[in-house]
Amino acid sequence: MKPINIQDQFLNQIRKDNTFVTVFLLNGFQLRGQVKGFDNFTVLLETEGKQQLIYKHAISTFAPQKNVNLELE
């Protein structure tokens, strides 16, 4: 049985759905936008046509504007 990677499923679903998300950083700063891509270490966030590459180790929380449907089975 293949292990479930919730992080990748979550990020991929909000990317595919173009869901707006608030990203809370460890320093308390908040970024709002859409996830355009991600890898093991970074997340590419687009806000008002501008891109920001955020390192995952700096992220505390993702708060999407709507619920994300995941296939956890």
UniProtKB/Swiss-Prot annotation:
Pfam families: Hfq (PF17209). GO terms for molecular function: RNA binding. Residues 8-68 form the Sm domain. GO terms for cellular component: cytosol. GO terms for biological process: regulation of DNA-templated transcription; regulation of RNA stability; regulation of translation, ncRNA-mediated. Keywords: RNA-binding, Stress response. CDD domains: Hfq. InterPro entries: Hfq (IPR005001), LSM_dom_sf (IPR010920), Sm (IPR047575). SUPFAM superfamilies: Sm-like ribonucleoproteins. Homohexamer. NCBIfam families: Hfq, PRK00395.1. Belongs to the Hfq family. HAMAP family: Hfq. RNA chaperone that binds small regulatory RNA (sRNAs) and mRNAs to facilitate mRNA translational regulation in response to envelope stress, environmental stress and changes in metabolite concentrations. Also binds with high specificity to tRNAs. This is RNA-binding protein Hfq. It comes from Bacillus pumilus (strain SAFR-032).
